[in-house]
């Protein structure tokens, strides 16, 4: 049996955690890059009531969108990776 840290789903999970640490560091210190205003489709997503109520983790809307996208991707990767591990 392989080590857990060598599995792809675990590496994806670590990448998600590192991104969250970066986002928190930037939010707390204000040392992050300046972002443009949102227009078009991303702005429509951020302005949804559901998104503002339940998925607003940071003050920066770009961080919120990236967090939701990476979170969904990470969950899918973990589920598929663990099911492959169980089958083997």
Curated annotation (Swiss-Prot):
Recorded GO cellular component terms are: plasma membrane
At the top level, the lineage of the source is Bacteria
Q: Does the keyword Glycoprotein apply?
A: no
This protein's record includes keyword Transmembrane: yes
Q: Where are the transmembrane segments?
A: 13-33, 62-82
Localization terms from the record = Cell membrane
Protein's membrane topology: Multi-pass membrane protein
Q: Name one Pfam family in it.
A: YfzA
* Keywords (A to Z) from UniProt: Cell membrane, Membrane, Transmembrane, Transmembrane helix
Q: What is this protein called?
A: Uncharacterized membrane protein YfzA
Organism (species)? Bacillus subtilis (strain 168)
């Amino acid at each position: 049996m392989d080590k857990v840290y060598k599995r792809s789903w675990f590496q994806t999970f670590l990448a998600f955690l590192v991104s969250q640490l970066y986002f928190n560091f930037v939010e707390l210190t204000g040392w992050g890059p300046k972002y443009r205003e949102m227009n078009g489709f991303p702005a429509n997503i951020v302005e949804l009531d559901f998104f503002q109520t339940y998925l607003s983790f940071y003050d920066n809307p770009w961080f919120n969108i990236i967090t939701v996208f990476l979170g969904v991707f990470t969950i899918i990767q973990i589920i598929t990776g663990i099911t492959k591990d169980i089958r083997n």
